[in-house]
Amino acid sequence: MNKIAIVTGASQGIGRGIALKLAKEGYDIAFSFFSATQRAEELCAEIQSTTAQRCAMYCVDMRKDGAGAKFVNQVSEEMGVPCVLVNNAGRTRMESILDMTPETVDELINLDLKNYLFCMQAAATQMVRAKISGSIINITSTRAERAYPCDAVYGGVKAALNLSLIHI
């Protein structure tokens, strides 16, 4: 049975590095990306050319309600139940409290909080049903712990995520 890892937001940065490392450790990789199609294709090609692992990329707008859970469930159906979920997709928005908009607040809550919670719920449900003892890893930020200028929304959302994780 192949080990399957899901990494959200893996077309670049931290997520890309995590996906490459997991592939080198013997995991088949399913990852989401949003707009960096060329980078996503390059990552899949690199995984397939440097390891013997399968790689599948999914264009997912994690800002949309239900998108994260749908992605996890789709991967489970198409590749098998994951034993690792790495929640990494996110976006940093630095705005003064005077300039923030309801759209910015909604975007960051959906992407950096709700998405993480519902991806975890979907992955944990799949793992429990399949009797898989898996791992769920959530990438957060030091911005949850320290005050930064123009960071009320992003830092607040990451702090909410960190506190939620303590209670799971």
Regions flagged by a language model, labelled:
Residues 120, 157:
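Active-site helix of classical SDR
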Residues 141:
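Residue(s) in the substrate-gating loop at a strand-loop-helix junction
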Residues 96-97, 104-109:
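Substrate-binding pocket helix/loop in short-chain dehydrogenase/reductase
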Residues 27-42:
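Conserved glycine-rich Rossmann-like NAD(P)H-binding loop of the short-chain dehydrogenase/reductase
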Residues 11-13:
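Conserved glycine-rich cofactor-binding loop
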Residues 167-168:
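Conserved small/polar residues in nucleotide/adenosyl-binding loops
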Residues 98, 146-152:
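Active-site loop immediately N-terminal to the catalytic Tyr-X3-Lys motif
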